[in-house]
């Protein structure tokens, strides 16, 4: 696990956006795993700006979103398909036919989950998976007690997650309690994982994910198993890490190493 601690949410978004942009420059036909919620919005704004400035293209990109509410059509303003269209897809040069969000209105949700897994595999797997983290350590809609090798499936949301997401729904509006989500095993299959977290409300979850035991009680702790997981967090989200100064030291040494390697490559 690479732990990157930055000053604030703006720096976190900038770092994450640059990582994705560099991925697309290396591999223009990358397969991106994308996330919703408040955390990635600033990152998406930076991707839109870079695309509109001609700094990066999404023409060859295929994308798969982590999750979707079960029971909402893609045209519903609170659906994650609507979120992705309005926050990113409609503003960049991506082929919308190559953007995938689990179908919240599927007649047969079980079959839809199996088909989603097959689509990811047919695309060659996910090159970089973007994640947020819930206060209870959930990633996607993999709530505590989720199997660490689980695949895309229907999940019941915890009351804590329902309450966290209630701010996105109008008073009295129907709020789903079920979702379709990539499983933890599906997420771990990605070649690289990028998790962003900001704010003191995420500090306990970050501590459990990074320094706690590998446990289904904190789904994000499964990232300890990943060969290339990068956690980019601000000072507030890092505030409860016992070894945060050590993580800063490791990252500083890593940056020096990368600079040396770049200099050697430039001198070839």
From Swiss-Prot:
InterPro entries: Glc/Gal-6P_isomerase, Glucosamine6P_isomerase, Glucosamine6P_isomerase_CS, NagB/RpiA_transferase-like. This is Glucosamine-6-phosphate deaminase. The active site is at residues 67, 136, 138, 143. It comes from Shewanella loihica (strain ATCC BAA-1088 / PV-4). It is an enzyme of class 3 (hydrolase). It comes from the Bacteria. It catalyses: alpha-D-glucosamine 6-phosphate + H2O = beta-D-fructose 6-phosphate + NH4(+). Its EC number is 3.5.99.6.
